[in-house]
Amino acid sequence: MLQWLGVMAAAAIPFVESYFGAVIGVLAGLNPVVAIIAAVVGNVISMVLVVLSADRLRARRGVTPVEQLSPRKQRLRRMLDRFGVPGVSLLGQTVLPSQITSGALVAFGASTRGVIGWQVVSIILWGVAFGTLAVLGVDLVQNS
């Protein structure tokens, strides 16, 4: 009965996110719509907390000297320069979790509001896509 809370909590974990959270919910027997919504909500809550924390930290620290970026952050920076916040938000989940991607975008100076908006769109799209694939996979296995 409270499985959706477990799905929400799981989806808040980086690398589980809305996509695997939705799959977990479907495999646990939740209604797919409930599983996807719970996964999306959990992922969005954790992402917003990270974005707001990164924004506060950026405001406190002000402009800092350029530091040496890790290879993943360098790749993320190149993606930001090439595709902007929408592209990184939609494609960044193939490289890093939304929490890390969104925090890095804010740290790089992107608009907090824009990051949250595009990350929500991305989280919904990825959650729906993987939730749908999970439903199709379960149906395929059950009907074999």
Which functions belong to the PLM regions below?
Residues 15-16, 41-49, 121-130:
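Membrane-embedded alpha-helical segments of transport systems
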Residues 104-105, 130-132:
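Surface-exposed beta-strand edges and their flanking turn/coil or helix-capping segments
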Residues 1-8, 27-97, 113-114, 132-144:
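Membrane-interfacial helix-loop-helix
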Residues 20-22, 46, 84, 102, ...:
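Hydrophobic side chains within alpha-helical segments
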Residues 100-124:
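Hydrophobic alpha-helical transmembrane segments and immediately flanking/interface helices
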Residues 11-24, 94-104:
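Transmembrane helix boundary and interhelical junction motifs in multipass membrane proteins
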